[in-house]
């Protein structure tokens, strides 16, 4: 049973990484940025059964395979720490650092301190709603490329979207 599960998992990883590299090639991207936190699976509490399944997902192995496949196509893969990327707003130009996190916003009496409206929905200072994962992804990019800026008049990121697109991978 474990062998079959592992084979399905690695088959999915190979298909997913191929789709990511193909998507990057179609967009003309030469760099893929991935957020990664050390020991991020240890503090998760989703329930006994879900935790058992979730802990077994080889995130590091997926990154290794993605780096290998991207390197074959001439694409660079960069991993970076994700800290404070989901607590700060890309649209408002906030740097993803401790001083702009929820705790420090609360100390400075900046409201709202937690701008997650619902699960998966983030609100910028001007009220613009953006998918929380998309906001976090743009902040991860800003951690690597700190000179990237966004304004409604000057977009340095081509194809900026506020809601993610869904990619279906047949297993």
Which residues does each PLM region occupy?
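Substrate-contacting helices/loops that form the catalytic groove of nucleic-acid
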Residues: 1-63, 151-171
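Positively charged, low-complexity nucleic-acid-binding target-recognition regions
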Residues: 51-55, 63-171
């Amino acid at each position: 049973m474990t062998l079959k599960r592992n084979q399905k998992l690695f088959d999915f990883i190979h298909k997913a990484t191929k789709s990511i590299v193909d998507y990057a090639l179609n967009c003309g991207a030469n760099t893929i940025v991935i957020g990664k936190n050390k020991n991020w699976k240890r503090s998760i509490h989703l329930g006994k059964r879900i935790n058992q399944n979730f802990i077994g997902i080889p995130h590091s192995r997926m990154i290794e395979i993605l780096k290998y496949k991207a390197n074959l196509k001439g694409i660079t893969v960069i991993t970076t720490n994700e800290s404070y990327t989901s607590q700060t707003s890309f649209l408002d130009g906030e740097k993803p650092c401790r001083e702009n996190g929820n705790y420090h916003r609360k100390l400075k009496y900046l409201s709202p301190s937690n701008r997650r409206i619902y699960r998966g929905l983030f609100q910028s200072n001007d009220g613009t709603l953006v998918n929380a994962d998309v906001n976090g992804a743009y902040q991860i990019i800003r951690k690597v490329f700190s000179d990237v800026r966004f304004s409604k008049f000057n977009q340095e990121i081509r194809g900026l979207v506020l809601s993610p697109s869904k990619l279906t991978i047949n297993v």
